[in-house]
Amino acid sequence: MLALSKEVLGLTNIWYEPALHHASTLTLPEGPSIRVISAPYFLATKMEAFRGRGKMDFQASHDLEDFVAVIEGRENIVNEIAESPRDVRDYLAQAAKGLLAESRFLDVLPGFVLDDERVPIIEKRLAVIAGGAK
């Protein structure tokens, strides 16, 4: 659930509205339909939350953990981001560039994955995403 107005949950995120604007509709097996945001917009909401409410706490941020899980778990995430609108693509490129330049992130990254062998995969995906940074 995304709250577009701060009054609803006491917080909001600059990426919620664009995420919903670009969301797709999914009909559930029992009939109701829901709106589903794309992985790139989900990543943008998570990075914004990490930077805002998460106060860039590299060790304890669930938002950063979610961000890393999506980068690790979606094989096509680099292509999904490349095919996204420029605003979200640029935001994620800057975010990836910033993470790779941050020693605190590189230090905690192995703690976000079950297998240390996945760390280079995540770093490589972030480097490709960061390659689009302006």
Give the residues covered by each predicted segment.
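Compositionally biased terminal segments of proteins
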Residues: 1-134
